[in-house]
Regions:
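Mixed-charge, Lys/Arg-enriched low-complexity segments
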Residues: 2-8, 57-122
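Amphipathic, interaction-prone secondary-structure segments
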Residues: 13-56
Length: 122
């Protein structure tokens, strides 16, 4: 079975189904550089009602941002056409791995955020 260009297809959650019966889509793609993407199109996704896609960027399973993929400080970009998703996937594949000091900061930042119940800076 051929893989979808967006990645491996995942089962979408029932509450994300389109009210008009359209098929909900969810794909996950992992890259050798440690990045991964989750691409969705459903009733509540950014652009989903118009048939457009939302992409979330992750690094070793943690949401992250990267220039030319997401807006600064944002981990999600929406309202993407199929062609725009494919362009972003090509860019993600070419990203260099993150330096370890940045990973430690993001990890610690996540711990503080989780303990305080919000997602802010340390």
């Amino acid at each position: 079975m051929d893989s979808h260009p967006f990645g491996d297809q995942r089962v979408a959650l029932k509450f994300h189904e389109f009210s008009d019966g359209r098929k909900t889509e969810h794909y996950v793609k992992c890259f050798a550089n440690g990045f991964s993407t989750s691409v969705i199109c459903h009733e509540a996704s950014y652009g989903g009602k118009k048939g457009l896609y939302e992409l979330m960027l992750q690094y070793h399973g943690q949401p992250t941002s990267a220039d030319e993929i997401t807006a600064p400080g944002d981990t999600i970009c929406g309202w993407l056409t199929k062609e725009e998703v494919l362009e972003k996937l090509e860019r993600v594949e070419k990203l260099p791995p993150k330096p370890k000091d940045k990973l430690v900061h993001e990890f610690l930042n996540g711990l503080v955020s989780d303990q305080n119940g919000f997602y802010g800076e340390m």
